[in-house]
Amino acid sequence: MIQQETRLKVADNSGARSLLCIRVLGGSKRRSAGIGDVIVASVKEATPGGAVKKGDVVRAVVVRTKKETRREDGSYIRFGENAGVLINSDGSPRGTRIFGPVARELREKGYTRIISLAPEVL
């Protein structure tokens, strides 16, 4: 459950370290984002020499949430942190590596490139 003002870690090597959610995309009344949803965020911390700088406004897809997500079989999955991956306007990841596990719900949402780069899919 990511909403406005939520801080997220960045799970790729795009140069950003942490994000602040500005907006959840997908309708004017949409308040929260889950795994696989796209948000607009501001870069709050960045590594020197990275592709993005502090203060840049970027789009990101949520790959891990602390709030549990219910699956079709009745099981739940949750992670220890909120994390996102920066994406371009066409939905492809901006970084070349993904760090940490990602949820398999991303495959159903069409983010196969993120799935293939991730070291572990839960």
UniProtKB/Swiss-Prot annotation:
Keywords attached to this Swiss-Prot or TrEMBL record, sorted alphabetically, are: Ribonucleoprotein, Ribosomal protein, RNA-binding, rRNA-binding
Q: Which CDD domains match?
A: Ribosomal_uL14
**Is Hydrolase included in the keywords of this UniProt record?**
no
One GO location term (cellular component): cytosolic large ribosomal subunit
Gene Ontology molecular function:
large ribosomal subunit rRNA binding; structural constituent of ribosome
What PROSITE patterns is this protein classified in?
RIBOSOMAL_L14
Q: Which GO annotations describe the biological process of this protein?
A: translation
How would you summarize the oligomeric state and partners of this protein? Part of the 50S ribosomal subunit. Forms a cluster with proteins L3 and L19. In the 70S ribosome, L14 and L19 interact and together make contacts with the 16S rRNA in bridges B5 and B8.
What family is this? Belongs to the universal ribosomal protein uL14 family.
Which NCBIfam families did the record assign?
rplN_bact
Please give the function described in this protein's UniProt entry: Binds to 23S rRNA. Forms part of two intersubunit bridges in the 70S ribosome.
Record-given protein name: Large ribosomal subunit protein uL14
Gene responsible for this protein:
rplN
